[in-house]
């Protein structure tokens, strides 16, 4: 089923009554999806899905059917068990609804890795403009790479001011010196 720009199904415009939208950003395998699953208390996507092959995944409260919005703004219902058929180059966002209490307070947007060759900066730029804050996940063993710093600098300063840096995989730091840094 296709809905041409049907705002009843998907609305990127902020309204006064909209909930905060928290974007999870960082490099590939930095723990964004793991963090999403942890804070939501359940896996959002089937475990067989390779997150690095997905466009942004927007999770909101509810039980509506999942869908994807293509680059033209058209909305298409999707099967979460067939996400391997979703083309990241033609999908602006996947929206999934879950009956999770936390989602009554905020939406979560799980962004692809910032170095994803399948997604241009322009493709996620429109979506990140909808975010109210970012939780930036970075590997503790390789924290704050040049690519992360460059992407961070490209974000609106108002968004930077309301965001957090989360060091993931801290347990991989073995020496006390590395842990102290």
Label every PLM stretch briefly.
Residues 16-181:
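Globular "head" domains of long coiled-coil molecular machines
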């Amino acid at each position: 089923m296709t809905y041409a720009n049907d705002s009843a199904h998907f609305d990127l415009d902020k309204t006064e009554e909209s909930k905060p939208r928290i974007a999870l950003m960082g490099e590939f395998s930095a723990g964004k999806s793991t963090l999403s699953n942890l804070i939501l208390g359940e896996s959002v996507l089937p475990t067989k899905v390779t997150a690095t092959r997905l466009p942004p995944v927007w999770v909101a409260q509810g039980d509506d059917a999942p869908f994807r919005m293509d680059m033209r703004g058209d909305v298409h219902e999707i099967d979460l068990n067939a996400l391997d058929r979703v083309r990241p180059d033609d999908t602006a966002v996947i929206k999934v609804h879950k009956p999770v209490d936390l989602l009554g307070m905020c939406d979560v947007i799980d962004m692809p890795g910032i170095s994803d060759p399948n997604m241009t900066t322009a493709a996620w730029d429109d979506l990140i403009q909808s975010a109210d804050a970012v939780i930036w996940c970075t590997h503790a063993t390789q924290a704050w790479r040049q690519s992360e710093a460059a992407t961070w600098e490209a974000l609106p300063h108002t968004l930077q001011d309301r965001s957090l840096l989360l060091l993931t995989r801290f347990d991989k730091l073995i020496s006390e010196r590395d842990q102290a840094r």
